């Protein structure tokens, strides 16, 4: 899934991957060392390397496409919420608005923190936290994820 997210991101602009294992980073992406203090700190480490508009896109979104990311960026200050109320992606025209509010109910916390618009972009809605989440994706898998799972096109 990370490969699909990076590929879609590179088609739109830069791709930074915050990780403690640089061997998993696909070609073309920049590695940012994960400070090891949770998702909020990881995102802050990545944002420290970005001037201007940033898209924060979780790596467990196998249906993401370049068109979806362009649409998301065009939404301005926006978030893509998962069905469970967590946050799958943030669009930050000004990265300084970021606050580490991830976790259960994070979409509501982000909206309370700043005037985030909630976007309805199907490719950003479904994250894969469990095997059952894959059933929701049907034909929306990216090419790398499809190949990894050996799902026919």
Predicted regions and their residues:
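Active-site acidic Asp-centered loop
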Residues: 57-59
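Charge-dense polyanion-binding interfaces
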Residues: 143-153
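Short, polar loop motifs at secondary-structure junctions
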Residues: 17-24
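Conserved core of the sugar-phosphate nucleotidyltransferase
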Residues: 61-139
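A structural signal for isolated positions on well-ordered beta-strands in alpha/beta enzyme cores
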Residues: 14-16, 55
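General small-molecule cofactor/ligand-binding pocket signal
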Residues: 16, 32, 117-120
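Short phosphate-binding loop-to-helix
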Residues: 27-55, 106-109
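A short, N-terminal amphipathic alpha-helix
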Residues: 1-14
């Amino acid at each position: 899934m990370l490969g699909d997210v990076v590929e879609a991101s590179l088609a739109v602009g830069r791709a930074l991957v915050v990780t403690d294992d640089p061997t998993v980073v696909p070609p073309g992406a920049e590695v940012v060392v994960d400070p090891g203090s949770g998702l909020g700190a990881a995102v802050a480490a990545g944002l420290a390397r970005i001037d201007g508009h940033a898209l924060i896109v979780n790596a467990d979104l196998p249906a993401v496409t370049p068109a979806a990311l362009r649409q998301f960026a065009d939404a301005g200050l926006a978030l893509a919420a998962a069905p469970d109320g967590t946050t799958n992606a943030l669009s930050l025209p000004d990265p300084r608005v970021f606050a580490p509010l991830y976790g259960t109910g994070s979409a509501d916390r982000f909206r309370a923190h700043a005037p985030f618009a909630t976007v309805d972009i199907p490719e950003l809605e479904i994250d894969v936290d469990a095997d059952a989440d894959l059933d929701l994706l049907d034909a929306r898998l990216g090419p790398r994820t499809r190949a990894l799972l050996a799902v026919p096109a």
